[in-house]
Amino acid sequence: MKLRKRLDLLMENKIKELRYAIVQSVPVMLGYLFLGFAFGLMLNDAGYGFWWAFFISLFVYAGSMQFVLVTLLTAGASLWYTLIMTLFVNGRHMFYGLSFVEKFKKIGATYPYMIFSLTDETFSLLCDLKVPEGMREGRVSFYISLLDQCYWILGSCVGALAGSMLPINTTGIDFSMTALFTVIVVNQWMDTKEHKPAVIGGAAGILCLILLGADAFLLPALTITAIILLGVKKKCYIPSES
């Protein structure tokens, strides 16, 4: 009887944590469903259908790089060129991981997935995450990460299906990722009094864009920004499972 009660209590807590994670991930859900839809449309327009959208979103799950990947697939780019381009486009994720790697290790078996699923939007949610008393923040963090990827996969698959059945003009859809990043920056700016990271990042980006051009500025700009901000106290915290 005691074991049954403990199991029931454990299941009840997990359900509460999942519900809380769903609520917290709603902003990302709205963005990912639309952006995933846009990616699915572009992928189908390039000649790759539903299953391509599903497996790319399942195993690649790289947001902006997936939009670039459509162009690379169409152009028949080599594997090495794709790897280099991925480093330039999504190299920023390495810097995200630096502030979470030790915390993720303490979460447990979900550690590898937490590293894999750390996108821009998930990173933003986990940085600001505060859970009610009695909930395990590590588990809520896992649920948020998993839900975010599910939103992206769903949007991608629906977009690919819609593109195969409806005559949709995809001109300008690739700008949707840029629009999302802009909204995130504006929201972060309004929600905090500390604007130094945004100013430093913006200045580094503009400088590298002028010096290196649009095709090669991103990774150097991120490197410069990370070096300057290394001494800044990090406010992101994800406790271990307990």
Question: Can you annotate each of these PLM segments?
Answer:
Residues 1-20:
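Short, Lys/Arg-rich, polar N-terminal cytosolic tail immediately upstream
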Residues 136-223:
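Membrane-embedded alpha-helical modules
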Residues 61-64, 88-95, 180-186, 205-207, ...:
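Alpha-helical transmembrane segments and their membrane-interface exit regions
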Residues 66-72, 95-100, 186-191, 209-218, ...:
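Juxtamembrane membrane-interface segments at transmembrane alpha-helix termini
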